[in-house]
Amino acid sequence: MSVILMVLLLAGCRMSISLTGGTVDARAKTVAINTFPNNASLVNPQLSQVFTTALKDKIQGQTPLTIVATNGDYEIEGEITDYTVNPVAIQGNDSPAMNRLTITVRVRFTNKFDENQNFAQSFSRYADYYSSQNLSSVETVLVAEITEALTDDIFNKAFVNW
């Protein structure tokens, strides 16, 4: 009798897999991550591919999910909405000592098993650089730094509920 009761209890349990502080529903096997088009006014031509690849790598590296083209158990889509450079840290002579590169992405996350986990949210991160530097000379490093921070934020929101 106790064996039957245990089997019934286990059959009704919903398990989740924990990874680096996050959870993935045990029923989830796949995630579809669409390319994030760059809809910002100022366009870095590589940013769409760099960002999308980084997000896929982050999720693939920290979850047991398989990336699929469409109809994933989880779906992540969105667009790059802002890519701006603004002066910060103005000096005494009214010229900026630093510039700030800011990237903003709009993300829509869908969990087919739990719609309470769905969200649509903008994420924004920045990196500063000396105004004496030309953006083109530091852009690749800054984009990598900002992209890593953005993918961490998106991962945490989707899988850590942070």
Predicted features along the sequence, with ranges:
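Compositionally biased, intrinsically disordered linkers/stalks adjacent to structured regions
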Residues: 139-162
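Short loop/edge segments at beta-strand edges and connector loops
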Residues: 69
